[in-house]
A protein has these predicted regions:
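Juxtamembrane intracellular "pre-TM" segments in multi-pass secondary transporters
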Residues: 1-11, 191-226
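Substrate-agnostic recognition of the 12-TM MFS/MFS-like secondary transporter fold
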Residues: 13-29, 52-68, 72-84, 104-162, ...
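Small-residue hotspots at the loop-to-helix junctions and early N-terminal turns
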Residues: 31, 40-47, 141, 255-262, ...
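Structural signal for membrane-spanning alpha-helices in multi-pass inner-membrane proteins
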Residues: 33, 88-95, 158, 162, ...
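Transmembrane alpha-helix termini and helix-breaking/packing motifs in multi-pass membrane transporters
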Residues: 33-38, 91-96, 153-173, 249-251, ...
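C-terminal transmembrane bundle of multi-pass solute transporters/carriers
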Residues: 59-62, 70, 74-76, 80, ...
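Helix-loop junctions on the cytosolic side of multi-pass membrane transporters
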Residues: 98, 129, 171-200, 394-407
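A single, central transmembrane helix in multi-pass transporters
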Residues: 165-172, 210-270
């Protein structure tokens, strides 16, 4: 791929397939959550459905990652999309012939979350190979911009569709998008093969699994970066709970103002992604930029709810822009550093860590929200994450810097 521009046949196709998948996901996730609450009138039952989406991440990824690392990633991607297509067609049929059944949506969430584990690991191991050498930052900038852009457009569209289109037809529409995505993915030439053609045995699986753990024990820089990202992601999700509660209860604030603040963050992400597509940060500067962003981001989170509303908007815009910058630099560096035959295993191990951190931090947010003022809880969680940034990113510069400066040969 060396010497080519970013928009090769394979990169264009995987980007188009990603767009179709994101549109489908955004089109069905909100309506399903709205439907469950409308039918049950229970926040607890709605939350249980959401929790089912996290359960497969706790262990399944670690168990299947060695197999995915040895396999053709394209087959996994196309196969999982085909399986999801069948699930959506089945849901269209079930919802057409029968009334609402809570257990059906619990099963649907568990099945789609399980399939997503396989899909996500195969995608994260395959996608770096589809970016032309030398275009890594631009490639990750584009992929990192897709979700916020589509989310801005699809959130109101999905809410509108929920009121205008029957549930069976929504499932059929998403199935049609998946069928189109499969057709696009099937035309990608690079298949992500790592297999030697040998028979894969339980003994080799255990050996591959152990190799993943050994790599993480040996590579302190990778371990530090992924551990911090588990902290940061969990912190962001948990503080969002307290921020929503603050906007719902504080005088002079409203849910609409919270939505505008989220839009400011998304706009920052879009502008940052566009800038990174045009301007590349040299590898030698990635670590310094990342250190600054992590400290700045957590300080802004700590101060957010103590600011006047206009400053909150500026805060979220800046964090959106800088957050996308650091995420793109991290993805570029880490995927250049990781051996191709270990990507799924390493990502799976840290997905498990991230899922555990998410559950713990959301519990912490719930406890702090009951015991303290909401903005105090946000400041404490963000302060804890700032300490994690110092301990895991800033201080171990000797082992972290080589990861951030990595380039593909």
């Amino acid at each position: 791929m060396k010497g080519k521009g970013l928009w090769t046949r394979d990169y264009t196709r995987i980007t188009l397939a990603s767009i179709l998948s994101i549109i489908g996901g955004e089109a069905i996730n909100l309506p399903v959550s709205l439907l469950v609450f409308d039918e049950t009138k229970s926040t607890l039952l709605s939350a249980l459905v959401m929790m089912c989406g996290f359960l497969p991440d706790l262990l399944l990824g670690v168990l299947v990652a060695p197999v995915i690392d040895r396999s053709r990633k394209k087959r996994w991607i196309v196969g999982m999309d085909a399986l999801l297509l069948g699930v959506y067609l089945a849901m269209a049929a079930f919802t057409h012939i029968g009334p609402f059944h809570y257990g059906l949506y619990v099963a649907f969430t568990l099945v789609t979350a399980t399939v997503s584990v396989f899909y996500r690991l195969a995608y994260s191991a395959w996608f770096p190979d589809l970016i032309p050498s030398g275009c890594e930052q631009q490639g990750y900038a584009v992929s990192g911009t897709l979700y916020p852009l589509i989310s801005i457009v699809m959130s109101p569209v999905a809410a509108f569709l929920y009121t205008q289109i029957s549930v069976p037809n929504m499932f059929l529409g998403v199935a049609a998008l998946l069928a189109l995505s499969i057709a696009v993915e099937a035309g990608i030439r690079e298949d992500g093969a790592q297999s030697t053609g040998e028979r894969y045995t339980l003994r080799k699986w255990r050996s591959d699994l152990a190799a993943g753990f050994q790599f993480i024990r040996r590579e302190k820089g990778i371990r530090n970066i992924y551990t911090y990202m588990s902290f940061a992601s969990a912190s962001g999700e948990s503080t969002a709970i307290l921020i929503r509660a603050y906007f719902q209860t504080a005088p002079g604030l409203s849910v609409t103002m919270l939505g505008l603040m989220s839009s400011a963050e998304m706009i920052g992400r879009l502008i940052s992604g566009a800038a990174q597509y045009r301007f590349t940060v040299p590898p030698k500067r990635r670590y310094g930029v990342t250190r600054f962003v992590y400290v700045f981001y957590q300080l802004m989170d700590m101060l957010l709810l103590f600011m006047p509303y206009g400053a909150m908007l500026a805060n979220r815009f800046a964090c959106g822009a800088l957050g996308t910058l650091s995420a793109t630099l991290r993805s570029t560096a880490v995927n250049s550093y990781l051996p191709a035959d270990l990507r799924a295993r390493v990502n799976a191990l840290f997905d498990t860590m991230g899922a555990c951190a998410m559950l713990l931090f959301e519990l912490l947010a719930g406890v702090l929200g009951q015991a303290l003022a909401y903005r105090t809880g946000v400041a404490l969680i963000s302060g804890l994450t700032l300490l994690a940034a110092v301990a895991l990113i800033l201080l171990p510069a000797k082992v972290n810097r080589p990861v951030y400066e990595a380039t593909r040969g």
